[in-house]
Every structure is written in structure tokens, then in C-alpha cells.
């Protein structure tokens, strides 16, 4: 009678593993806007272009709708609407920073669509930006997309190919 119990005990860990669905691995980040992608080094901001905040890309937007490049939880949504942090279910952390020094606009020209704590899917709107107003105020509207926890991942590789849409992979991620 002890044999079936032992067999069950041996099967239980395997059965438990089968019941647990691991988080779908995040293998890519898409462009957060339609526009032209560029290497991070070409972004006119020394902190971002140095890679100090992680590997990523710059995107000069041609449209003002900025969307989530990955699915996850919005962990940061600045009141000014210019920056968003998203953490995926498997721990990839991305920062979407809209424009250079645009925090100085204090939200003018930015219409946020999400708030901290909200779940988003890839492609969900984060903010609508009046690109003309940003330019008229003298600011560079380049969007910076970086993986802020690059150091804890196996590889974070920017894939830059000029014109992009919100379904274009701009960063490949390997755990």
C-alpha cells in the first residue's frame, strides 16, 4: 500500500509544475510611436545616449499617439505626461520618455491615457502628444525607449531600421 503513495509523491512535483503557468517571456519591445528609429547614441541627451539608464533606441515621432511597447503594469506615470515606466510580468522594466527636457512643459501638449498601477497590453495608448506644440515651445520630441534593468538580463539588443510603426520590434530581449 505504500508504493502508490510514493508514486503519488513522486508525481506531485511534476503535476504542480504543469499547473503553474510561467509568465510569458518578454522577447521584444515594439516602437512606442510611428516615426524614425535611431541608435540611442544619436539622441541629443547625454544621460540617455550614454546608456546610463539602459540599452534602447530613440524614435523621432511622426504621429503624436504614444503606445505601450510591451504588455505589463504601468509603474510610473509622470503627472506631466512625458514619462512612463512599465514592468512586464516576467520582470523586464522599460522607460518611455517622450521628448528631451519636456518635463519643463508641465504637461502642456500632453494628454495622458494611463495612470500608475494600470495594466496595459502592447499597443495600448499611453499618451497623446501635440508634437507641433512641443516643437513650437523649442523642445526636441524624440522619444527614448530604454530597458532600465538591462544589466540583469542576458541581452538587450536594439534593432534599428529607420521607419517604424507601433508593431515594429525595436529592441530584442533575452533573459
Task: Give the residues covered by each predicted segment.
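Pore-lining transmembrane helices
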Residues: 1-4
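Contiguous, well-folded functional domains in the mature portion of proteins
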Residues: 6-175
Amino acid at each position: 500500500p505504500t508504493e502508490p503513495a510514493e508514486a503519488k509523491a513522486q508525481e506531485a512535483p511534476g503535476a504542480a509544475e504543469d499547473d503553474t503557468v510561467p509568465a510569458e517571456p518578454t522577447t521584444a519591445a515594439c516602437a512606442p510611436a510611428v516615426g524614425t528609429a535611431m541608435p540611442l547614441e544619436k539622441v541629443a541627451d547625454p544621460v540617455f545616449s550614454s546608456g546610463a539608464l539602459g540599452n534602447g533606441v530613440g524614435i523621432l515621432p511622426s504621429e503624436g499617439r504614444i503606445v505601450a511597447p510591451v504588455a505589463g503594469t504601468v509603474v510610473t506615470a509622470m503627472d506631466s505626461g512625458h514619462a512612463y515606466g512599465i514592468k512586464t510580468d516576467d520582470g523586464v522594466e522599460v522607460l518611455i520618455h517622450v521628448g528631451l527636457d519636456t518635463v519643463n512643459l508641465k504637461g502642456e501638449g500632453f494628454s495622458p491615457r494611463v495612470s500608475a498601477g494600470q495594466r496595459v497590453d502592447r499597443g495600448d495608448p499611453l499618451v497623446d502628444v501635440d508634437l507641433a506644440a512641443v516643437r513650437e515651445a523649442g523642445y526636441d520630441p524624440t522619444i527614448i525607449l530604454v530597458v532600465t534593468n538591462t544589466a540583469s538580463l542576458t541581452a538587450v539588443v536594439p534593432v534599428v531600421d529607420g521607419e517604424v510603426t507601433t508593431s515594429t520590434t525595436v529592441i530584442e530581449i533575452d533573459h
